[in-house]
Amino acid sequence: MRVLVLGSGVIGTASAYYLARQGFEVTVVDRQPAVAMETSFANAGQISPGYASPWAAPGVPLKAIKWLLERHAPLAIKLTGDVDQYLWMAQMLRNCTASRYAVNKERMVRLSEYSRDCLDELRAETGINYENRSLGTTQLFRTQAQVDAAAKDIAVLEQSGVPYELLDRDGIARVEPALAGVKDILAGALRLPNDQTGDCQLFTTKLADMALKLGVEFRFGQDIQRLDFAGDRINGVWIDGKLETADRYVLALGSYSPQMLKPLGIKAPVYPLKGYSLTVPITNSDMAPTSTILDETYKVAITRFDNRIRVGGMAEIAGFDLSLNPRRRETLEMIVNDLYPRGGDLSQASFWTGLRPATPDGTPIVGATAFRNLFLNTGHGTLGWTMACGSGRLLADLIARKKPQISAEGLDISRYGNSREVAKHGQSAPAHQQ
């Protein structure tokens, strides 16, 4: 059975790999010249199931208003006039209740924990190396109010059986020695010892190499134009003016997925959250982080690779704008100077931005659609790296009609009450603009 995977980020590549392991004939198509060239290229590098939480949370609407007035705020909104932007924000606001937050977080943690287990198994089986570390994540609190507010997240961690450790200032210096000199600006921390780190682009590149050995074909530099369909089946995909056919189709196009799906009558509430990162060469290993640090105040992650520090964060709701905002670089540099002033050379840092495909409830869209041979793997937001292996393996099991190792409840697009709004006769979805 032939499967055509659209998109070669970490999600599409993981989908292809796990499909090939189940014996499918897999072809991956992407407009870029190699895998992991867009959202997966320079993300924060953290694999943090315990911190899998939706942005839509109680109190966020009021925080968002406050953040809009701050220079170094973690969230910014630039209204584009796009109706989809307004609808997405309205849906997000509806998910900012305690009950919805609990449901959404459970789904995210369920998939994230499974994904971490899949990654551990993959690493044990193959020895894949991607500058990975398994030394946990430490969430830094600069105020006592932040420490107190963490009680709600700790309750969810306990319910999910996720190990954690509350740290005072001395405890912070114990797990992250380079912070000893600045511990007085901190009020405490929450550490998740089972979290991991690694270079997502490097991982995706090596996973693609392993997929090639399993027979997966990668076709780069090709324009995915539109889906051709009739009734409840996809007939093929128009790629560079030619109709490509397969038995099953997987859409893993990140923020661009809705543009392909809308003409089919599928409303996928996935919207780009623009994020930024700095990659800083390490000049003093003893003054650099040991693993991943999360700065709760600025919602920024600082991750240690072999000889580099990756600093990533922020969310701009600004459509598909990929311009680099110098103010965001200023914020990232400020945080590095706050916490690791002697760790790396900021003058040699590379500045990057990418579009995270986010759903309004935080949970990705993984699973079947109203079309019998079309499957989705998109909408992972800031957790694409954390959820990649689990999402790919889960989807491969669903396509193979095998019982997944975790419940897939609440993960597919049916949770949004989607119904097709197209005619029954054959149509083609028009080309999506990228």
From Swiss-Prot:
FAD binds at residues 3-17. GO terms for cellular component: cytoplasm; plasma membrane. This is D-amino acid dehydrogenase 2. Oxidative deamination of D-amino acids. It catalyses: a D-alpha-amino acid + A + H2O = a 2-oxocarboxylate + AH2 + NH4(+). Pathway: Amino-acid degradation; D-alanine degradation; NH(3) and pyruvate from D-alanine: step 1/1. It comes from Pseudomonas putida (strain ATCC 47054 / DSM 6125 / CFBP 8728 / NCIMB 11950 / KT2440). Its cofactor is FAD. Its EC number is 1.4.99.-. Keywords: FAD, Flavoprotein, Oxidoreductase. InterPro entries: DadA (IPR023080), FAD-dep_OxRdtase (IPR006076), FAD/NAD-bd_sf (IPR036188). It comes from the Bacteria. It is an enzyme of class 1 (oxidoreductase). One of its GO terms (molecular function) is D-amino-acid dehydrogenase activity. One of its GO terms (biological process) is D-alanine catabolic process. The keyword Oxidoreductase applies. Belongs to the DadA oxidoreductase family. The keyword DNA-binding does not apply.
